[in-house]
């Protein structure tokens, strides 16, 4: 996620996040099959179907931005609203069967940009982009605690997305520099130990990294560089404490739009979310463009971002968070392969 948009919307969202920071923050069915047709570049064009409207534009912040879709152990979908003001729901639950929406958690300070359940303690971890913290709550929104806060190697963080390894250690994209020119690269990828909360910088001087997800076999990371519209592959050492090799894996020709969060399915395919257009782009592990998933044409005018996607574990039921002037929505489609941990939050 990035809390701003291309053009005029970028300014509005940046102001909304600044306002949060100044106040202490910064009839149901499972996912239906999407319609599809061949695209010009060989990837299929798929149309997602509206599941439910989750939020409306907040008067105080001037926008709403849904992010961080993730399923809990009981199969319930949770999302975060990045720009929700103090006191309004910042974590919400969406019943994909009844399409009912209910509040889970709020506070007076956080601007939460992603969410994922830890395999270590089954708590929901939230990245507070404005506050530079990583908080956690129970699946019911209780016992709010701060897992990590403060500087890393002398510099504050803008924690954006997160991913857990199989042991529960956390890997975070630090989007420092997101609001500046790409050549002033200050972003990082940071590993945080599950037991000690000790932070280690794995990569630095990056152009505002955003999406982060493990490969299907947990041997490496996919990292989306928001400031470069590029996805990098990082091969990790055996215990995941160092990057052994890295390379640019694919480039996104997005024009004024930029890449956002990343999810990975059981076949290793990358679902690349986008800030600036309401579509998800799907690539093979070798960089082949397999599919583009968009909202219906009559809905696209009032929606400018599809910032994240989750696939229900063990199924191909996929749900993407879509936001814009019309509000915050969840759309559903059929994924190309089954969901795994790497496509469930972050």
Regions found by a protein language model. Give the residues of each.
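Secretory targeting and sorting signals
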Residues: 1-35
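Beta-rich, blade/repeat-based domains predominating
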Residues: 60-76, 88-89, 107-125, 151-170, ...
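Conserved beta-strand positions in repeat-built beta-propeller and related beta-rich domains
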Residues: 73, 77-86, 124-130, 170-183, ...
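A short loop-to-beta-strand structural motif that recurs across blades of beta-propeller domains
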Residues: 89-92, 133-135, 187-190, 230-232, ...
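Short loop/turn segments that connect beta-strands within beta-propeller blades
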Residues: 94-99, 138-142, 192-197, 235-240, ...
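Asp-box/WD-like beta-propeller blade repeats and closely related beta-sheet repeat scaffolds
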Residues: 131-167, 172-179
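Blade-level signature of beta-propeller repeat domains, shared across WD40, Kelch, NHL, RCC1
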Residues: 305-346
């Amino acid at each position: 996620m990035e809390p701003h948009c291309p053009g005029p919307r970028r300014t509005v969202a940046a102001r909304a996040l600044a306002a949060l920071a100044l106040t202490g923050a910064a009839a149901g069915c499972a996912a239906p099959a999407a319609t599809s047709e061949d695209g010009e570049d060989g990837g299929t064009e798929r149309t997602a179907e509206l599941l439910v409207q989750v939020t409306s534009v907040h008067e105080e912040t001037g926008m709403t931005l849904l992010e961080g879709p993730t399923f809990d152990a009981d199969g319930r979908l949770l999302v975060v609203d990045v720009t929700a003001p103090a006191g309004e729901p910042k974590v919400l639950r969406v019943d994909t069967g009844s399409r009912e929406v209910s509040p889970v958690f709020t506070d007076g300070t956080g601007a939460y940009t992603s969410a994922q359940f830890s395999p270590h303690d089954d708590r929901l971890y939230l990245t507070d982009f404005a506050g530079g913290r990583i908080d956690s709550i129970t699946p019911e929104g209780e016992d709010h605690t701060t897992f990590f806060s403060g500087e890393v190697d002398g510099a504050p963080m803008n924690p954006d997305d997160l991913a857990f390894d199989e042991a529960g250690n956390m890997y975070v994209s630090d989007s420092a520099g997101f609001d500046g020119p790409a050549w002033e690269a200050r972003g990082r990828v940071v590993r945080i130990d599950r037991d000690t909360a000790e932070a280690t910088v794995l990569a630095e001087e990056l152009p505002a990294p955003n999406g982060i997800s493990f490969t299907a076999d947990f041997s490496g990371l996919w990292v989306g560089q928001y400031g470069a519209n590029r996805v990098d592959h990082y091969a990790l050492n055996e215990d995941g404490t160092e990057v052994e090799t890295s390379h640019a894996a694919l480039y996104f020709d997005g024009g004024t739009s930029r890449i956002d969060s990343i999810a990975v399915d059981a076949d290793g395919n990358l679902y690349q979310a986008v800030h600036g257009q309401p579509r998800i782009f799907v690539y093979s592990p070798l960089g082949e463009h397999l599919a583009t998933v968009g909202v219906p044409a009559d809905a696209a005018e009032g929606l400018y971002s599809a910032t994240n996607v989750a696939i229900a574990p063990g199924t191909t039921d996929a749900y993407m968070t879509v936001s814009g002037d019309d509000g915050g929505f969840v759309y559903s489609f059929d994924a190309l392969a089954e969901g795994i941990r790497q496509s469930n939050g972050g």
